[in-house]
Amino acid sequence: MMEIGLNHYLVLSTILFAIGLVGVMRRKNLLMLFFATEILLNSVNISFAAISHYYGDLTGQMFAFFVIAIAASEVAVGLGLLIVWHKKHNNIDLDNMSTMRG
């Protein structure tokens, strides 16, 4: 039976990073932009944890927990701002964000 090694995790992480990057570049909906950013951050977490496990060091796993904490605070603040924006303007498209200036 085939063993799942470091390369498998890194390939998975690269695929998820590419999906998240395409999502960040192509999406106009702010909620989908948040989801794509979370996919990016979680792909980095997979890389940190896999490399950390491969070398037998816990540093990468600690970085992954730190990134999870930062991502959670980012989502809390971002979704709060998104809800306020939606209540005021009834949409969450990035094209309409230019009215926020001033």
UniProtKB/Swiss-Prot annotation:
List its EC numbers.
7.1.1.-
Membrane spanning residue stretches = 4-24, 31-51, 65-85
The organism's place on the tree of life at top rank: Bacteria
Where, per UniProt, does this protein localize?
A: Cell inner membrane
Similarity remark: Belongs to the complex I subunit 4L family.
Summarizing the function annotation, the protein's role is: NDH-1 shuttles electrons from NADH, via FMN and iron-sulfur (Fe-S) centers, to quinones in the respiratory chain. The immediate electron acceptor for the enzyme in this species is believed to be ubiquinone. Couples the redox reaction to proton translocation (for every two electrons transferred, four hydrogen ions are translocated across the cytoplasmic membrane), and thus conserves the redox energy in a proton gradient.
- Name of this chain's protein: NADH-quinone oxidoreductase subunit K
The species this protein was found in: Sulfurimonas denitrificans (strain ATCC 33889 / DSM 1251) (Thiomicrospira denitrificans (strain ATCC 33889 / DSM 1251))
Its taxonomic placement starts with: Bacteria, Pseudomonadati, Campylobacterota, Epsilonproteobacteria, Campylobacterales
Gene label: nuoK
